[in-house]
Amino acid sequence: VTVHEIPTSEQLADIAISSARVVKLFGYEPKIAFLSHSTFGTPKTKATKNLRDAVEILKDKKVDFKFDGEMQPDVALDSKYKELYPFSEIVGNANVLIMPGRHSAAISFKLLKSLSAVKVVGPLLIGLGQPIEIAPLRSSTSDILNLASVAAYSSSIINYKNKKKN
């Protein structure tokens, strides 16, 4: 498993599926938004094709969680846009944001952490089958404790599933 610089549409769909699984483990209903500079094809560019294709892959797989995209971050998070996009259950309600690449994810994470009053936990490594988290440089004590808590919780889930198999 690797962290993808620029994920393919299949990798983006897999990231969404793995993210939904983690969100469910924490007791929440996943509402996944694929983020972009474009909102639902306006403007339609080559850069957004992977995101649109990932959404189609998830539709074909008939996954058991809500998702939509591509959309800009404000559309994903601010309910005032529901009137403009009434066809989407995700607009204004997203609790998972899938970025089009590692660079945009890193920039967005640092911006949220620096400018937001909301507690940001992460970045989380998902899909490794092990409770591994990496504390970024300049992590606070609180950040490290949150990542350790996520790893401990993940470990208990992984151990529980392994015991059920045996």
Outline where the language-model segments fall.
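Active-site rim loops that border cofactor/substrate pockets in soluble metabolic enzymes
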Residues: 1, 37-96
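N-terminal start-of-chain detector that recognizes signal peptides
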Residues: 6, 68-72, 104-108
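Short active-site-adjacent structural elements
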Residues: 76-77, 105-110, 142-143
